[in-house]
């Protein structure tokens, strides 16, 4: 009998494997991505002090896209977090894709953040 593959459980395992080697500091925080079926979220996290420096999502008041779950929305969230980070004086970060493949929405968010001026 075949077992059903749980994609989210596999993603969490990948995320834990990746997180062993990724840490963010206040000078170079970790850009963490989370996507649900309806929204996409991004945070710049300082792992040394355990706090979130900047956050952006499709639920923000500053978000201006019509749809909240497609690639265009992900690119807008990337640009939004990039602008907020530059305003706070953060220019570099470490990209944490949270176990998701670097494809589609995750890739668009990363490109949006790069176009706003973040370097990673």
Curated annotation (Swiss-Prot):
GO terms for biological process: translation. One of its GO terms (molecular function) is structural constituent of ribosome. Keywords: Ribonucleoprotein, Ribosomal protein, RNA-binding, rRNA-binding. InterPro entries: Ribosomal_uL18_bac-type (IPR004389), Ribosomal_uL18_bac/euk (IPR005484). One of its GO terms (cellular component) is cytosolic large ribosomal subunit. Pfam families: Ribosomal_L18p. Belongs to the universal ribosomal protein uL18 family. This is one of the proteins that bind and probably mediate the attachment of the 5S RNA into the large ribosomal subunit, where it forms part of the central protuberance. Part of the 50S ribosomal subunit; part of the 5S rRNA/L5/L18/L25 subcomplex. Contacts the 5S and 23S rRNAs. HAMAP family: Ribosomal_uL18_B. This is Large ribosomal subunit protein uL18. It comes from Finegoldia magna (strain ATCC 29328 / DSM 20472 / WAL 2508) (Peptostreptococcus magnus).
């Amino acid at each position: 009998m075949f077992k059903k593959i749980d994609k989210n459980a596999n993603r969490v395992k990948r995320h834990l494997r990746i997180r062993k080697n990724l840490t963010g500091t206040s000078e170079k925080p970790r850009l963490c991505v989370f996507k649900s079926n309806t929204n996409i979220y991004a945070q710049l996290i300082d792992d040394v002090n355990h706090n979130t420096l900047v956050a952006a999502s499709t639920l923000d008041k500053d978000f201006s896209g019509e749809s909240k779950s497609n690639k265009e929305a992900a690119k807008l969230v990337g640009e939004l977090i990039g602008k907020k980070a530059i305003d706070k004086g953060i220019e570099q970060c470490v990209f944490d894709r949270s176990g998701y493949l670097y494809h589609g929405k995750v890739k668009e968010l990363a490109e949006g953040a790069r176009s706003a001026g973040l370097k990673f």
